[in-house]
């Protein structure tokens, strides 16, 4: 890999994780193979191709690898917003290994993974304190995000529509066994949004995830300090919004961090590669104390999970949701296996 034309400081401004050449062994090996190429980051993805950057506010339209356009090429092996690539002129010639990635199962009957964003440090789960507030859905987001190696942070918006914000925060904490960060803000105002700055330090990359109408575009505009993203109205009957964000885009923030805004997601299907170790650490720990290793936590003797329910230290509904999510993950894994044969 050749020295970036703009220098590493400019690359750092769009999320390059080192002050100089890559310190990761896998990156070093690939950069050695493509020694005459230069690094860039994918900041937009369209059907017609990609837009990358080597510095803030300097977009470059580039050609993708020819293999990515071939029918049947795995979609999850193509570049996505947040990825780092190597360029030869205006052509992508290689995709650098991902440090983290958030993905889901695409809608439809066929098994197909859909990547949301790559090389993230944190994901803000944006949820309005109106009809959009759904602790179980947030729990599902946390599983998807945590399984990709990304830190989840819940950002509650529309605080003016909630009579008891503290109660909503308490409900979320009850539904999570991990030390889940929950921040309630008025997404329209800069002062309360400043509570998010600990996750928006220079060099960090954060994605906004959530339903349409949750306030992602409003929050983006406040963080940018300008009205760049279109904001849509929300239907009162179901608190649903229209898709004002139609594609994923990486935006450098004044704080020095990078923000990836994403369209609203209605479905959160698992790929089969997730685990519940982080989000359901309490149940996973109890399971290690059961008499039998293959305990199904139903009516087996010596079941520590059932004992916890009996003494009131574990909510039966939490166990029910654990079984539900685990069943979905196993089912998706089975579909993935069948697809290979």
Swiss-Prot record:
Catalytic class of the enzyme: hydrolase
A biological process from GO: ribosomal small subunit biogenesis
Residues annotated as binding GTP: 157-160, 210-218
Cofactor: binding details: Binds 1 zinc ion per subunit.
Subcellular location field: Cytoplasm
Primary residence: cytoplasm
InterPro entries: G_CP_dom, P-loop_NTPase, Ribosome_biogen_GTPase_RsgA, RsgA_GTPase_dom
Pfam families linked to this entry: RsgA_GTPase (PF03193)
Cofactor: Zn(2+)
GO cellular component annotations of the record: cytoplasm
HAMAP family: GTPase_RsgA (MF_01820)
Role of this protein: One of several proteins that assist in the late maturation steps of the functional core of the 30S ribosomal subunit. Helps release RbfA from mature subunits. May play a role in the assembly of ribosomal proteins into the subunit. Circularly permuted GTPase that catalyzes slow GTP hydrolysis, GTPase activity is stimulated by the 30S ribosomal subunit.
Family per similarity comment: Belongs to the TRAFAC class YlqF/YawG GTPase family. RsgA subfamily.
Protein name: Small ribosomal subunit biogenesis GTPase RsgA
Record gene name: rsgA
């Amino acid at each position: 890999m050749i020295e970036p034309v703009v220098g590493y400081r400019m690359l750092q401004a769009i999320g390059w994780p080192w002050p100089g050449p890559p310190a990761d062994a896998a990156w070093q090996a690939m950069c050695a193979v493509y020694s005459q190429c230069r690094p860039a980051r994918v900041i937009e993805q369209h059907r017609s191709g990609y837009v990358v950057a080597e510095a803030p506010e300097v977009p470059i339209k580039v050609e993708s690898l020819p293999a990515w356009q071939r029918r049947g090429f795995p979609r999850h092996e193509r570049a996505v917003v947040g990825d780092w690539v190597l360029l030869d002129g205006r052509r992508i010639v290689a995709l650098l290994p991902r440090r983290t990635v958030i993905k889901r199962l695409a809608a439809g009957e066929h098994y197909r993974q859909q990547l949301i964003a790559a090389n993230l440090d944190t994901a803000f789960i944006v949820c309005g304190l109106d009809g959009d507030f759904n602790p179980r859905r947030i729990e599902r987001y946390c599983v998807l995000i945590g399984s990709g190696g990304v830190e989840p942070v819940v950002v509650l918006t529309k605080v003016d529509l909630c009579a008891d914000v503290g109660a909503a925060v308490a409900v979320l904490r009850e539904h999570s066994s991990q030390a889940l960060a929950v921040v309630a803000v008025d997404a329209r105002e800069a002062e309360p949004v400043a509570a998010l700055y600990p996750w928006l330090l220079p060099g960090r990359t954060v994605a906004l995830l959530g339903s349409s109408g949750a306030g992602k575009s409003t929050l983006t505009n406040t963080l940018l300090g300008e009205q760049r993203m279109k904001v849509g109205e929300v239907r009162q009957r179901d608190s649903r919004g229209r898709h004002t964000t139609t594609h994923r885009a990486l935006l450098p923030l004044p704080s020095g961090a990078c923000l990836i805004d994403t369209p609203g997601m209605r479905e959160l299907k698992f790929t089969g590669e997730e685990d519940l170790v982080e989000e359901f650490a309490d149940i996973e720990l109890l399971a290690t104390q059961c008499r039998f290793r293959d305990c199904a936590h139903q009516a087996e003797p010596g079941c520590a999970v059932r004992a916890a329910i009996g003494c009131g230290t574990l909510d039966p509904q939490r166990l029910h949701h654990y079984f539900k999510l685990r069943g979905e993950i196993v089912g998706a894994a089975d579909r993935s296996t069948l697809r290979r044969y």
